[in-house]
Regions:
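Hard-cation-handling environments
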Residues: 241, 410-485
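Single-stranded RNA-binding regions, centering on S1/OB-family and related RNA-binding modules
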Residues: 1-117, 122, 126-130, 136-149, ...
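A residue-level signal for conserved active-site and pocket-lining positions in enzyme catalytic cores
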Residues: 118, 167, 382
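Gly/His-enriched, cation/cofactor- and phosphate-binding structural elements
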Residues: 143-155, 159, 171-179, 184-186, ...
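N-terminal accessory interaction module
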Residues: 160-167
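Conserved beta-strand elements of beta-rich interaction domains across eukaryotes
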Residues: 139, 170, 369-370
Length: 485
């Protein structure tokens, strides 16, 4: 047959009267009898495929293409199996005019049937239903489809497909969810139109707020601002599309300040824009690196974990964010590994850059690109990027640039400007103590991120007394260790 075949799919609620003799329909095998195979054309209509018209061996729930031979007066449908190459036809849904809903509006439609067009961003098989995480132009939610316990529903649906989902809007464990009655993959112009609509909305939502400007007067930061906005937008879009983020950073005080500022912004942004309240635990991971570059050991760990998550939990491959490392020629071997897996990589670093690595990066923030130098530290860059990701975190992280600056012994004028922002709250000596405490504690943490301990050192946990006692203890221990060397 030619390349212009149309295969019809009977939409939910459609009846026998909506079927046309001679047309080809997409169905699912319901069961078997001695005289033939029963084929479901939708949730209400089924037909009989006589054994003389069977061309291939099928199992229950398998998809099958059938042509309608005859619709009998009593409503029984006689079918004949046809075989077509996947690229030789387009599927067209037979349905009444569709009233589309948006995921963001589900909370106002609990108990009602909805139709959603969305991108599949995760597929997770549980011991019960299959959970499809879907993303439209308004948000991300889960759609639960059940065939039988532990059996994959809609096996034809893959990660990255555009789907039309029919089902009931429900609330489960205080989270919105769609109980799926039907789902099918959109192809061709239908899929393209949905992708364009979603992409246009995501581009607008991912754009950092226009009113966010650098905290201080700085020619270097002003010149870098457009690239910083670009990097922040990539991070925001990753969150909005349910793409995991791996943040790798140098395991010193400057790198920690850079990474924790972005971590603070991203975690809150995930909670503000996601469906699953626990998703910040698996969509973001911060990992310190011993070397000031992306080592083969580090990229191997990351690849191993992300590929396992992709297979086990149906997650997208992650965005790799490198901070206080990533700009040098020493990073090249790891970038070649990321290229094999077509990973998205972005960098915010203040080490002298090598232009040969730029071809591997979607965004590259480095003060050397605009006439600056290492005095504008990674912690300064990270704090400004964090504000672009989520401006609401600014009061929590306002002291990070000063801590990072004194940690790296910056002589840039930006350090004094950042210190002036926290005058009356933290002294320069207190910033030095936090920096030393971070370096000392990270030594014992090794490759662990020490999230809550680090937050206490940086006074992020609203426990100032514990912060003061912990920093004082770590500084004492660090100084004793230095004297013993």
């Amino acid at each position: 047959m030619g390349n212009t075949n149309t295969v019809y799919r009977l939409g939910p609620g459609r009846e026998v009267d909506d079927i046309v003799e001679g047309q080809i329909y997409l169905g699912n095998v319901q069961g078997f009898a001695t005289f033939g195979t029963f084929v479901l054309l939708n949730d209400r209509v089924k037909g009989l495929l006589h054994k003389s018209n069977v061309k291939s061996e099928k199992k229950e729930r398998d998809q099958i293409l059938v042509q309608v031979n005859q619709i009998r007066p009593n409503g029984n449908i006689d079918l004949r199996e046809v075989t077509l190459a996947e690229d030789s036809y387009e599927t067209q849904l037979v349905t009444k005019k569709i009233m589309l809903s948006r995921l963001a509006d589900l909370k106002n439609k609990i108990g009602r049937n909805v139709t959603i067009e969305a991108d599949v961003v995760q597929i997770k098989q549980t011991s019960g239903p299959t959970i499809f995480t879907i993303c439209d132009d308004s948000g991300v939610e889960d759609a639960a489809a059940f065939t039988e316990a532990g059996v994959r529903s809609y096996p034809e649906v893959n990660l990255g497909d555009v789907v039309r989902v029919f089902g009931e809007a429900t609330r489960r464990n205080n989270q919105m969810q769609i109980e799926v009655s039907d789902m099918h993959v959109l192809k061709g112009t239908e899929a393209d139109a949905v992708r364009v609509r979603i992409n246009k909305a995501l581009e607008a939502r991912a754009e950092p707020p226009e009113n966010v400007v650098p905290l201080i007067e700085s020619d270097v930061l002003s010149a870098l601002w457009s690239e910083m906005r670009k990097l922040a937008k990539i991070i925001r879009r990753a969150v909005l599309t349910h793409q995991p983020i791996i943040l790798r950073h140098h395991a010193d005080a400057d790198g920690i300040c850079a990474a924790v500022s972005v971590e603070t912004a991203v975690m809150q942004y995930i909670r503000d824009n996601g469906g699953d309240p626990d998703q910040d635990n698996y969509l973001f991971r911060r990992s310190p690196s011993k070397a000031p570059f992306y080592e083969i050991e580090d990229v191997t760990r990351d690849l191993d974990m992300m590929l396992k998550d992709n297979v086990r939990f149906g997650q997208k491959l992650p965005l790799i964010l490198l901070m206080d490392n990533g700009s040098t020629e020493e990073d090249m071997p790891s970038y070649k590994m990321t290229e094999v897996y077509q990973l998205d990589v972005v960098v915010a670093d203040h080490h002298h850059p090598d232009e040969t690595i730029d071809k591997y990066l979607l965004a590259h923030v480095n003060p050397y690109h605009v006439g600056g130098d290492f005095g504008v530290t990674a912690g300064m860059l990270g704090t400004e990027i964090a504000r672009l990701i989520n401006p609401a975190v600014e009061p929590k992280i306002l002291h990070f640039p000063a801590v990072a600056g004194v940690a790296d012994r910056s002589e840039a004028p930006e350090l004094d400007a950042y210190l002036s922002l926290i005058d009356g709250k933290y002294t320069k000596d207190e910033c030095k103590d936090m920096a030393l405490a971070l370096d000392y504690e990270q030594y014992w943490l090794r490759f662990n991120d020490g999230r809550e301990i680090v937050k206490d050192i940086l006074n992020l946990n609203n426990a100032p007394d514990r912060h003061n006692r912990l920093v004082a203890l770590l500084v004492t221990e660090a100084n004793a260790a230095i004297e013993d060397q």
